Amino acid sequence: MEKEVWRFIDSGNCSPAFNMALDEALLEWHSEGKIPPTIRFYGWNPPTLSIGYFQKVEKEIDMEAVKKYGLGFVRRPTGGRGVLHDQELTYSVIVSELHPAMPQTVTEAYRVISQGILEGFRFLGLDAYFAVPKTEEEKADLKNPRSAVCFDAPSWYELVVEGRKVAGSAQTRQKGVILQHGSILLHLDEDMLFSLFKYPNERVKERLRQNFKNKAVAINELTDRNITINEAKEAFFRGFEKGLNVQLERYELTDDELFYVQQLAKNKYETDEWNFKR
């Protein structure tokens, strides 16, 4: 049987506003039937703190620290918590809710899409599996996250490699389309990450930091060899093809598409109204 062909875009390192605008545009174009399901890889220039759609900047984020480090800042159209995008491979998957391979529930769709990530880790020679919360306490933890830091708690079907969470993902559904995007960390600057959020006091900050160490890990902490961004791209490209049983076809945006995304970035994702609205 011939495999279904999905589109693949590697947009390289882009501005925070452009990155979010392109994800939104792909969702829109797919909902209008203009493009097939799409998988996109990207990076960030400058390194960026992205926050979840529902987060309150004033209450949770130390904007002075964001400025001090020269980081970009953007609010995502997806939920979840704060993510520092630096040395990582970021991916997004855009596919119709009605696609025959997509289960109806968010959790199950998350598992199906994340199968591509799981296979990618295996191509890198790492033992990856899905964590499912078993105890009532673990389930309660999911509903009441203890901190604004996204990698703090594995969520349903979170990917765990060698017992530690490696890939954080968020999902939204709009116009009948699923957008899931997430981060695959190669390296992580923990000091920087923990200085970007507000805490009731130093003790809480330290406790969260210790917890975090046991739960979150970057790929290059798990292996002796240094995995480059290009190696990661290759592994996860193959991983998505295998995990979703599709053939990925590389695609470059047209000038018109590029212009549309740039306008959306400027008029929405670069504005204070969007980024600081809550």
Swiss-Prot record:
The record marks K165 as: Lowers pKa of active site Cys. Pathway: Protein modification; protein lipoylation via endogenous pathway; protein N(6)-(lipoyl)lysine from octanoyl-[acyl-carrier-protein]. Its EC number is 2.3.1.181. The active site is at C150 (acyl-thioester intermediate). It catalyses: octanoyl-[ACP] + L-lysyl-[protein] = N(6)-octanoyl-L-lysyl-[protein] + holo-[ACP] + H(+). Pfam families: LplA-B_cat. Gene3D superfamilies: Bira Bifunctional Protein, Domain 2. Keywords: Acyltransferase, Transferase. It comes from the Bacteria. Residues 33-248 form the BPL/LPL catalytic domain. It is an enzyme of class 2 (transferase). GO terms for biological process: lipoate biosynthetic process; protein modification process. One of its GO terms (molecular function) is lipoyl(octanoyl) transferase activity. The keyword Nucleotide-binding does not apply. Catalyzes the transfer of endogenously produced octanoic acid from octanoyl-acyl-carrier-protein onto the lipoyl domain of GcvH, an intermediate carrier during protein lipoylation. Monomer. Belongs to the octanoyltransferase LipM family. In the reaction, the free carboxyl group of octanoic acid is attached via an amide linkage to the epsilon-amino group of a specific lysine residue of lipoyl domains of lipoate-dependent enzymes. The reaction proceeds via an octanoyl-thioester enzyme intermediate. This is Octanoyltransferase LipM. It comes from Anoxybacillus flavithermus (strain DSM 21510 / WK1).
